[in-house]
Design a protein with these regions (language model features):
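Flexible hinge/capping segments at coil-to-helix
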Residues: 107-132, 143
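Bacterial N-terminal signal peptides
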Residues: 6-13
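Hydrophobic residues within well-ordered alpha-helices
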Residues: 49, 71-74, 120, 175-177, ...
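Short helix-loop capping/hinge motifs at secondary-structure junctions, enriched
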Residues: 109-117, 134-135, 151, 229-234
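Extracytoplasmic small-molecule ligand-binding "clamshell" domains
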Residues: 19-90, 162-166, 254-258
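A ligand-binding cleft/hinge motif common to bilobed small-molecule-binding domains
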Residues: 67-68, 74, 82-92, 177-216
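Periplasmic-binding protein-like
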Residues: 27-30, 99-102, 111, 156, ...
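Ligand-binding clefts/hinges and TM-proximal coupling segments of bilobed small-molecule sensing domains
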Residues: 56, 133-160, 235-262
């Protein structure tokens, strides 16, 4: 009897097993991908995965600047990094869950349809392009314009934008709407989301050719990133991404993300 009572008391006093937690690296001010209010589509996808895992979501908020991966995922401060280009060297990546492209953004009323990187009209236009820095690590459209001698009529907009304001990457799309530039070359998910909110109707068309000078693609597959020593987690996330493929597709469409067939 004493043994039974001791076992019963132990059970009654036991605390529940720790619930599983999915810790996510994310930028707190980077719509349409993520923000601290969890309004981005990456936030929503993470919530889908966590629900499937029976886990709660915890965020490590860190502005996506140089050193982002080194200071977050590689320091084991978080488990996954959503929205990373498939196959990057610094992390292990899952199979992609969407594929998008850089796009030309112009005012619909200007009739700038059918542009390509080699279109002679570009020489006469004010062009906006997303920039990273001056050390050779710029965006593919920036390199493509430079290779064609399109420099004097190009205005750079920092990829990260002014972090002191909400939605810092939106500045380049707003510049098109305001007429500060005639056309801009913008990463599709950013362009689609902010163009959908613009009071000025905007036209979006994929940048072509999609591969410039062999090393500058305009189309990217997007994956989740995990540490290389977490192959089991990577497989688990891949399985969940596959199970929720239809929901993810609908979610991306609701955020106006341009999709490219694989």
């Amino acid at each position: 009897v004493k043994a039974f009572l001791a076992a019963l008391l132990a059970l009654l006093g036991a605390t529940p097993a720790s619930a599983r937690e999915l810790t996510v690296c994310a930028d707190p001010n980077n719509l349409p991908f993520s923000n601290q209010a969890r309004e981005g589509f990456e936030n929503k996808i993470v919530e889908m995965l966590a629900k499937d895992m029976g886990a709660s979501v915890n965020y490590v908020w860190w502005a996506q600047r140089r050193g982002y991966v080194r200071n977050t995922l590689n320091e084991a401060k978080c488990d996954i990094w959503p929205g990373v280009a498939s196959g990057v060297d610094m992390v292990a990546t899952t199979r992609p869950y969407y594929r998008s492209t850089y796009v030309f953004v112009s005012r619909a009323k200007d009739g700038l349809a059918g542009l390509t990187l080699d279109d002679p009209r570009l020489a006469k236009l004010k062009i906006g392009v997303q920039m990273v820095g001056d050390d050779g690590s710029n965006t593919p459209p920036s390199h493509a314009l430079s290779r064609r001698g399109l420099i004097d009529n190009v205005r750079g907009y920092m990829l990260y934008g002014d972090y002191d304001r909400p939605n810092p990457p939106s500045a380049i799309v707003e510049a098109v709407a305001a007429g500060d530039v005639d056309i801009a070359l913008v990463w599709g998910p950013l362009a689609g989301f902010f163009a959908s909110r613009s009071p000025v109707p905007l036209r979006l068309e994929p940048v072509t050719p999609w591969l410039d000078a062999a090393q500058y693609p305009m189309i990217f597959d997007i994956s989740m990133g995990v540490r290389r020593d977490e192959p089991q987690l990577r497989r688990e996330i891949e399985q969940m991404l596959a199970r929720h493929g239809g929901e993810i597709k609908a979610l991306l469409e609701s955020y106006h993300v341009p999709s490219v067939a694989g």
